[in-house]
């Protein structure tokens, strides 16, 4: 197998492994609040929003220390160990107790930080400046396929149900646990790429990331270097500007992955289909994500205009979705009680409009995330692990804040927060992209990014 084929193989395996893991985890997150609302009528008392706030809060803090972990252990073993904790969290839903539920939330927050730092590093060392855009698109499309498969099962399994029984819950979460474990094992198929033509090849700390037989002294040096780089990159102009864009992706991640499905499941006017519509919503979010990731990955080789048009498309699509959701959903839908809400929206609540908005949310999200992955891999090719750690730190802390306020804020206030951050995040991305065009003058084939 040629070096380029080996790198592409690694990217595909990386994407497929994440597809399995996040088929389980994203489906879990999409239905968690609805499942827990049903559980709250028993001896269990908890909140899916609170669990997600814990996960993303711990995730954000842990991102500060994960570059040294990935530098020492390597991305492959880091992702495998993280996958085990993801599987543990999903398994807790089979017989949840408040203490085990929230404890698992803490552990998966740590695991997520390690997982995503290792993913960014693995993506970068298997790419060069000509393939980073393509590889980002391939990975993103495979990752977001996860939204399709798990939610398709939920749609058919929960058809016509207004409450989730213990049998329904266990059937779903046993299957999701097994799927997560399959994805975890797939990380062992990733091969060490040849050292030539890898992004950041001049940086020894990136070249050797997948080496496992190094001296303890060298490991310590790599850990200290990675830790220092994380703090240095935090205060660079480009990273500060991109952090505004990243903050927006954290807010809208919370909305489409946890809040929007809960809103749909709480609207009594949708009748007996309200619970199965949660699964259908997740499917159409996934279709939007897959379409965006595939399209922008294929077009990246011939995109003479850079990343800005894709991000502009993303924010326009999201603003349309937010406006339709504002009109179509009752304001109290995110915080409705177990029995749901009978409140009226500005227009008659439509299932078709709700599902259309799901698609638009997924498409817009793929616009932002594929371009952020691409520009980070390009600008910070020699410091990939610290750069992606900062990216996930900002994204996750904003997601944690959003999950926290989702317990209290009415829908229109949540939408307003996203509109404000989306507007300024788009402007800040444009600024970095325009400055990045200066790489052309230094001989980099910028159009292929």
From Swiss-Prot:
It is found in: Membrane. The chain crosses the membrane at residues 8-28, 53-73, 74-94, 96-116, 138-158, 170-190, 239-259, 277-297, 309-329, 359-379, 385-405, 410-430. Gene3D superfamilies: MFS general substrate transporter like domains (1.20.1250.20). Pfam families: UNC-93. The modification Phosphoserine is found at residue 204. Keywords: Glycoprotein, Membrane, Phosphoprotein, Transmembrane, Transmembrane helix. This is UNC93-like protein MFSD11. The gene is MFSD11.
């Amino acid at each position: 197998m040629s070096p380029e084929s080996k790198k592409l193989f690694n990217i595909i395996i990386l994407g497929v492994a994440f597809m399995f893991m996040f088929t389980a985890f994203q489906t879990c997150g999409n239905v968690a609040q609805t499942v827990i609302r049903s559980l709250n009528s028993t001896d269990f008392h908890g909140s899916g929003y609170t669990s997600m706030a814990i996960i993303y809060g711990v995730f954000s803090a842990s991102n500060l220390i994960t570059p040294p972990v990935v530098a020492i252990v390597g991305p492959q073993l880091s992702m495998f160990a993280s996958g085990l904790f993801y599987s543990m969290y999903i398994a807790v839903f089979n017989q949840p107790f408040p203490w085990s539920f929230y404890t698992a939330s803490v552990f998966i927050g740590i695991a997520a930080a390690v997982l995503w730092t290792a993913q960014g590093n693995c993506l970068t060392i298997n790419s060069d400046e000509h393939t980073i855009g393509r590889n980002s698109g391939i990975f993103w499309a495979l990752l977001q396929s996860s939204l399709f498969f798990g939610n398709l099962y939920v749609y058919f399994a929960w058809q016509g149900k207004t409450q989730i029984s213990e049998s329904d819950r266990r059937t779903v979460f046993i299957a999701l646990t097994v799927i997560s474990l399959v994805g975890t094992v797939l990380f062992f198929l990733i091969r060490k790429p040849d050292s030539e033509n890898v992004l950041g090849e001049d940086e020894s700390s990136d070249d050797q990331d997948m080496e496992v037989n190094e001296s303890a002294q060298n490991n310590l040096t790599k850990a200290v270097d990675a830790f220092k780089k994380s703090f240095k990159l935090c205060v660079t102009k480009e990273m500060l500007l991109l952090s505004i864009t990243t903050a927006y992706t954290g807010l809208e991640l919370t909305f489409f992955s946890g809040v929007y499905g809960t809103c749909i499941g709480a609207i009594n006017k949708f009748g007996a289909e309200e619970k199965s519509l949660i699964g259908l919503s997740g499917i159409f979010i996934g279709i939007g994500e897959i379409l965006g990731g595939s399209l922008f990955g294929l077009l990246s080789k011939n995109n003479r205009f850079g990343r800005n048009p894709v991000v502009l498309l993303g924010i326009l699509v999201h603003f349309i979705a937010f406006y339709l959701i504002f009109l179509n959903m009752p304001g109290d839908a995110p915080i409705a009680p177990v029995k749901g809400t009978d409140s009226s929206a500005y227009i008659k609540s439509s299932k078709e409009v709700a599902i259309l908005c799901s698609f638009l949310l997924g498409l817009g999200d793929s616009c932002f995330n594929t371009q952020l992955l691409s520009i980070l891999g390009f600008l910070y090719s020699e410091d990939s692990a610290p750069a992606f750690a900062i990216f996930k730190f900002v994204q996750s802390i904003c997601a944690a804040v959003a999950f926290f306020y989702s317990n209290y804020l009415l829908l229109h206030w949540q939408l307003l927060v996203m509109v404000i951050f989306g507007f300024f995040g788009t402007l800040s991305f444009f600024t970095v992209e325009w400055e990045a065009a200066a790489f052309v003058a230094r001989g980099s084939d910028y159009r292929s990014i």
